[in-house]
Amino acid sequence: MVQYILFALFLGVISAVAAFDLESKKKWLKPVIAGSISFLVFGILNFWAMPTFNFWGFDGLWVEITLAAIWGLLFSAIYEEYGDPALKNIFKMWQAIPLGICMLALLVRCGSTAEMFHSEAYSELLQPQVVADSTFANNVHPIPVEKMISVKQAYAEDLASKRIENMPSLGSRCEFGQADMINLNGTFAVKTAEGKSETLTFDNEKVWVMPLEHRGFWKWWDNKVTDGYCIVSAHDPGRIFFVTELEGKPLALRYLRSGCFGDEIERHCRTNGYAGYGLTEYSMELDDNGKPYWVITVYEPSIGFSGENATGCLVVDMQTGDIQEYAIADAPEWVDRIQPDEFLLDQIDDWGQYQDGWINAQFAQNGVREATPGMSLVYSEGRSYWYSGIQSAGADKSSSGFMLIDTRTKECKLYPVAGINEQAAKEVIEAQSEWVRQSKFAANDPVLYNVHGVPTYYMTLTGDGIKNAGYAFVSLKSELQFAAAATPQKALQQYLKVIQSGSQFKISDGDKLAEELVKMTVRGIVCENGTYYILFNEVKGKEFTGTTEAFPELKWCEKNQKVNVSYTDTEAKVISLNSFDIIDFEI
């Protein structure tokens, strides 16, 4: 806050000097008026716009210096026209100062930042490690189809908004904000908006979280805080929790995007010691106790005024406003994302464009590569990665590989796997699947998974609304390898059959696609979040999964029962069942 006040005072002094008139009888009146107006105007502007107050690498301070110079120039021009002719030479000299400042600022910024002069530095912002295709299965572990992300952001936000619509007293003053995906762990006691007390348990579960926000200035003025947040499972659209109490204490979220004055989250950070820091990517996350925080990326430019690199994060308590700053290596384990996707997309493009210099990137474009549109989150063993396809410049549907970038550390791996990009995968399903075409379904943005060692796009399908109407799998390596069905389990079964019958590449070593029924004895069975986990006497060291949506008999399964099952035998520790039937069982 001090920086904003001091700089507004500095601008006021400039205006006062420009307005000063030695010949006037009231020579102090005009400077005081001009300086006071300047101080108030720029003070309010600073508090509203919150520029980054750092001389090098950020535009905010330079822009305000230029504005101050122009402000002085305007006063100077007025006095040159109406003032004492004897002072005109002084005013002309004063006019040269703001013009010189503007030109100097422009030259310094361009010279220190332009890709033409710093192409090598831009190309080295991201340093991917090229790894063999065969290592993909080791780096990205397969997960059960029931744990794949089937609820997109827009769908999660719609589900949450419908929940609050059923509460008129709350819905009239609040609404849910932007949903952020996190990998949630922990067990904590909550009370929901419906008054239900329960204990929630999450084990590396992907969920969408969103805070309750104010509906405008007057709602903030009346209430100051909101009553909680919403959790929506990214796997199961029926698993929604509107949390208003945590461990017996009512939630009161104060520092929000919809807050005003000092309660607005960015202004709160800027006015509490972080005016000179680059801040971006305000994401909501929960710790292992369900406590809500803002996780904000701290960054600094590495090439003049560009080449932004994340250096750490701020963790802000959404209730108390307490701010903790962490370096990347010291951030709490529950923090998922520090690296903003917008930074990484720029760095991927810079890496792909400037490997052979700026001139080649602009003209010949030999070997120039770029990121495919958009990025998506990929999860493996509790860690999250940004996924981006890599394609040759100007390519529409093909990709020459893909990158996985750790969302905390920026560790980057490049898989040089030729195939199709995300847009092409969507078009394959919409155009080549007869069921999808006849149903007039649209494919949503895909997420990359390891399906028995094969890099595979998984996507949801929607009809007229945003509710899921189907599910699809498409191989990254071949547009001929795809399947779509009404449930994820059926789509996966069809996809595995397609791979088995017409694969143009080998399934990862040790994977055997077998559909024959195998007789097993149930050693143990538990249900967690709608997914059944089963152990068999005949198979040690592995657990099998399924849902009652795919196999209704699972709800009646007990220990020591004999069952017929089929599955794809892989090296994974958790395997999805392809079929399940209890022997001699009748309802």
Predicted regions and their residues:
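Soluble extracytoplasmic regions of secretory-pathway and membrane proteins
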Residues: 4-587
